[in-house]
Amino acid sequence: MIISLLHLNLNAQVFNFTSEEEGKSITHKVLLDSEYFIETQYVTDSNEFISTRGGFYELKEGMYLVRFEFNSNFSSDSLKTLNYKSTKWKQSKALKQDHSGKWLMAGRVRNGVEKRRTTSGARKTLKFLLDGHFQWTAFNTETFKFHGSGGGTYTAQEGDYIETITYFSRDNSRVGAVLPFRYDLKGMDWHHQGMNSKGKPMYEIWTKRVN
């Protein structure tokens, strides 16, 4: 299968385009850096989540071969790879922020006690941040089981990190919610504190992905 892209600069970028399916306008949002690619689809009018898929890619003969780490529709389409080439997408305005890059959930702090978890196993939670846009996805690289995803826009400045939810696979009623957090960058780690989408306190530790 081949899906279109045109003249993608290998710097971190965010793209959007729309398609029509069964009379509905579908928004496709693409997060792309020099090695990793995510495409997410949601209904344009309601922001209802449809699907997401992503993974590392390589450029071969003008085509982007994406080898998926996750595919929310894997149980129905069994896709593990996809080729992208040649068409024009609309690039979002670049808004450089702290945190840009790929992060893996590395642990939590509860009652003042830090508990780490491995980031090298098959079960991962990835957060991809580019140009003021974010997406987190929970998945298993071995079984392709999809555990959920959400994304939108964010700002990060002087310890304040604020997310605005555009799509959320688990609960569409959370679309539009604004979630304020505090952050602290410590070496390769991002300490992330506040209230989660259910209004419960959380303290997460994310670590910069290096592979």
Region annotations inferred by a language model:
Residues G151-A156:
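Beta-propeller blade signature
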Residues M1-H7:
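Bacterial N-terminal signal peptides
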